[in-house]
Every structure is written in C-alpha cells, then in structure tokens.
Amino acid sequence: MVEELSSYTPQDLTDLDALMHELSATSFCNEELLNSALNDANVHVYVIRDEGHIVATGTLCIKHTLEFTIADIESVVVSSKCRGRGYGKELMTAMIEAAKKMNVHHIQLTSNPARVAANRLYQELGFERYETNCYKMILA
C-alpha cells in the first residue's frame, strides 16, 4: 500500500538512502534533504513498505507557473529485490491520482533510457515521450 511520508524513523532514512543509491551511484538521501522535502508543502514523498522496510519511493513536486499548475515526478525507484511485484505501477498510479486531486494540469518526468522497464511502465500509464532539450546546471 502506498503512503505519503510525513515523518520517518532512522530505518526509513537508511532504506531511502539505499534506494537512492540503486537509482544512481551518485544519488543519496540524508536527514537534511529528507527534512527539507517533508517540510515543503509542494513536495510529496510516497513510499511502499514490505516487511517494515521502505522498498519503493517516488516524489511528486508541485509547481505553480503563470500558465498551469504542473507536477514533476522525481526519484522513482523500486528495490531491486522487490521488482516485478507491481510496486512501480502502484506507486505511479497513486502519484497520478494525487496530482489529479491537486488540479495539476500535467505531469512531467524524465527517465534514463537504460531503465527499460521503467520507461515501458510510464508509457503504459499514458505518459508520452516529447521532444525537448532538457538541461541542467549543477550548482553544488
């Protein structure tokens, strides 16, 4: 079952950090980042637990622009030990439904092409690939 995280235990932080490492070798989750996310009204961290451990997570970030209210889905990862159980679909469906309740116009996400199963899931859920230049500037 998907839950929106509002507080956490030391074990939750350990589980989330491990999941971020599975997402990318350079990704991590620490207490400062998690507290910032949980204290931001426009950031919604969703998790799925299995046997008391967080085994899947995704973050729904709401942005208000002059045109629309938009959501970005970030940091979606299911533990490699738990893949194939439908957790990714359950998590994504919950975030899509939450965005609808928040009157979001559209949801954006990016996904590494190497994440074949994730990309297939996003397309199955109705996401369409669109042509754009995606840029980032690392500041820290």
PLM feature spans:
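A conserved beta-turn-beta hairpin within the catalytic core of GNAT-like acetyltransferases
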Residues: K63-I73, R83, Y130-E131
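A short beta-loop-alpha structural element at the N-terminal edge
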Residues: M1-L16
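Conserved acetyl-CoA pyrophosphate-binding loop and the N-cap/start of the following alpha-helix
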Residues: C82, G86-A94
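Active-site acidic-Proline motif in GNAT/NAT acetyltransferases
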Residues: S79-K81, R85, P113-A114
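Conserved beta-strand in the GNAT
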Residues: V47, H53-I62, D72, V77
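Conserved GNAT acetyl-CoA-binding A-motif
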Residues: M92, A99-S111
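Conserved active-site alpha-helix within GNAT-family acetyltransferase domains
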Residues: K89, H105, P113-E131, K136-M137
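Active-site rim helix/loop that mediates acceptor-substrate recognition in acyltransferases
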Residues: A25-V47
